[in-house]
């Protein structure tokens, strides 16, 4: 039988608290690796007994070789008039994930080869990545892309892609039995509520509740990691 949360006095307050955490983490630029992931886990660790683990890039984990670490300082496109038409400072969705560094000037046709839009909605900025192929790009709305005039465009992506670490966090609570309950969520997607932030907020809330209990029948591991 489904739980009627409206009958639980504390539910509304808990919901507001978790929503507040999502608002804090929404602007943090996250990806598979990097300082955005570290900042996110550090914030969650203020509320729960989170253990943060860093594994060197290039490490073989089952069938996966851990990718290089990626960090971005700034990324933008300036139009012919010098105004910025796309800027990751406005939204972390604007930059193609794992874009390589670039500092160049291109014409509109060339820029168009590096722009990603959503054909289903003229006002939506899509989320796109290029983890396994070295390229660069920007994501914007189709309406903005189609309104760009002819001319020269300055493109700058100040990013690093190299040796570093893959960072994840976990909360492990001992149990009376040997079997383990694993609860996991992704931590790598930026500025996405359904796909990422809701899972992190929910696990943070669960970790606080479970950590406050004295006994657990099974070991419980709550993991925040890229999958």
Regions found by a protein language model. Give the residues of each.
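N-terminal hydrophobic/helix-forming segments and targeting peptides
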Residues: 1-225
């Amino acid at each position: 039988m489904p739980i009627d949360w409206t009958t639980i006095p504390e539910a509304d307050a808990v919901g507001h608290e978790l929503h507040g955490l999502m608002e804090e983490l929404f602007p943090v630029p996250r990806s598979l690796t990097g300082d955005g992931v570290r900042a996110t886990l550090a914030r969650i660790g203020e509320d729960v007994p989170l253990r943060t683990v860093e594994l060197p890039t290039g490490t073989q984990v089952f069938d996966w070789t851990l990718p290089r670490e990626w960090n971005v300082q700034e990324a933008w496109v300036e139009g012919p008039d010098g105004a910025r038409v796309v800027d990751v400072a406005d939204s972390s969705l604007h930059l193609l994930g794992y874009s390589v560094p670039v500092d160049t000037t291109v014409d509109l046709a060339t820029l168009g080869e590096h722009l990603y839009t959503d054909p289903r909605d003229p006002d939506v900025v899509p989320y796109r990545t290029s983890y396994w192929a070295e390229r660069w790009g920007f994501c914007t709305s189709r309406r903005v892309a189609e309104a760009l005039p002819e001319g020269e465009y300055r493109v700058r992506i100040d990013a690093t892609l190299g040796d570093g670490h893959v960072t994840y966090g976990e909360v492990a609570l001992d149990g009376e039995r040997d079997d383990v309950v694993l609860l996991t969520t992704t931590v790598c997607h930026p500025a996405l509520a359904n796909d990422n932030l809701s899972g992190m907020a929910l696990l943070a809330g669960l970790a606080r509740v479970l950590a406050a209990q004295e006994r657990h029948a099974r070991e419980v591991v709550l993991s925040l990691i890229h999958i």
